[in-house]
Amino acid sequence: MFEKDKWMSIGEIVAPQGLRGDLRIKPSSDFPERFTKPGKRWIQKTDELPTEIKLTKGKLIPGKSIYVLSIEGVSTRSSAEEIIGWKLVIPIDSRPMLSKDEYHYHDLIGLEARSGPSKALIGYVTDLIKGGNDLLEIELVEGKKVLVPFVKEIVPEIEIKEKWLLINPPPGLLEL
């Protein structure tokens, strides 16, 4: 049986590259070696078991946040097109250890967002948007989505094991 919480997406196959079966990958990982170091990986179609593959080479396209990967057995453009939309996944227990105040994307999604001295529930983390300053997408309990800067001053406390984080928003941030 497939256990969804034992796997973590590190990227998505978004397009073929050229005629020889190379693949464009949009990463959702901050660890470039996952896309450049040859070896065993897994790809997964939505709601199916991951399939083991062998990454033969990979490189970052200069000036873009896209990797081009070569996978053993995918040697034509049409075979590459068949797996567009599939995820590149890894076993969740193979994640690298992080320093204090560093978090895996997968661990943040679904956390309760709390606010104020009473730490009242205000919503849930639904996404992390990477950029110059990362943003947490929070779906508020009333259904509206807001973007919150993911900085210590606004998100001073994160309790991964207890599945919540504290937000101290500046006035008006949650009303936007």
Swiss-Prot record:
PRC barrel domain sequence ranges: 100-173
GO cellular component assignments: cytoplasm; ribosome
GO biological process: ribosomal small subunit biogenesis; rRNA processing
GO-annotated molecular function: ribosome binding
Main location: cytoplasm
Keywords: Chaperone, Cytoplasm, Ribosome biogenesis, rRNA processing
Any single Pfam family the record assigns to this protein: PRC_RimM
InterPro entries, alphabetized: PRC_barrel-like_sf, PRC_RimM, RimM, RimM_N, RimM_N_sf, Transl_B-barrel_sf
Subcellular location: Cytoplasm
Highest taxon of the lineage: Bacteria
Domain notes: The PRC barrel domain binds ribosomal protein uS19.
Family statement: Belongs to the RimM family.
Alphabetized NCBIfam families for the sequence: 16S_RimM
Function: An accessory protein needed during the final step in the assembly of 30S ribosomal subunit, possibly for assembly of the head region. Essential for efficient processing of 16S rRNA. May be needed both before and after RbfA during the maturation of 16S rRNA. It has affinity for free ribosomal 30S subunits but not for 70S ribosomes.
Assembly description: Binds ribosomal protein uS19.
Name under which the protein is recorded: Ribosome maturation factor RimM
Organism encoding this protein: Prochlorococcus marinus (strain NATL1A)
